[in-house]
Amino acid sequence: DVCSSDLGGVVNIVTRGMREQGVKTYADIGYGSYNTLQTEATNRIRKGRFTSVVSGSYNRTDGHRADMGFEQYGGYAKLGYEISQAWNVRADVNVTHFNASQPGTVTNPMADADQRITRGMTSLSVENNYGRTSGALSLFYNWGRHRINDGYTVDPNDTNNPKDYRFNSRDDMMGVSWYQSARLFRGNRLTVGADYYRFGGEAWNRYVEGDRKGERSDIADKSQDEVAGYVDFRQDIGAG
């Protein structure tokens, strides 16, 4: 495979389940203009009631202008196990880190506009399905870490000077969700559930030069919790 275009953002990994028993491993690599490289390796396993997908990738490009480099590292894993015909458990994790530079416009170029960003997510779910009733208990956690240099314009007549600080932020979101749904009679569906979510984050500037080198200047630090319960009753009119 040869890719002639440069990368513009995070690459999302889309996985497909393996139906037959066994182990399969795939690897892809592509190289194109602007020193663009795309690589990915994936391993899939189905053995009895156990399934797994593990994937890793590395992508990079110099971009079509100076100070426009981009590189991304990614890893993904998904595990599943069928406890019985009615119960199964699944877990997955996905982590991506990328380094990127922003050169500004052609008429007003910038220098040192660099960012390093890491984002990830993980989840665990236990599901049941008895035909007339089904449900799940799910837990998830998402997080992010950002380190950004806003950079400066290189025009000597501009007063926008190199920054003596770096912007930092950290955010996360976690939650627990449970529901159970039952079909009491034809055309009817009753669902009972509850959710808990917590999300928040903090942002600050870290000084890297000058008299304040090493100091931290806080910008924001907030979090919020939400709890909800629900009962949903549905009936198809005219169902016999």
Where are these regions (language model features)?
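One face of beta-strands
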Residues: 25-27, 52-54, 102, 135, ...
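Short, charged, solvent-exposed linker or helix-capping segments at domain edges/interfaces
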Residues: 21-26, 89-91, 103, 149-150
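Exposed loop/turn and edge beta-strand positions of beta-sandwich/beta-sheet ligand-binding modules
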Residues: 7, 21-23, 37, 73, ...
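Short aromatic/hydrophobic contact patches that present stacked aromatics
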Residues: 12, 26-28, 76, 140, ...
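Transmembrane beta-barrel wall of Gram-negative outer-membrane proteins
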Residues: 31-60, 65-99, 113-134, 184-185, ...
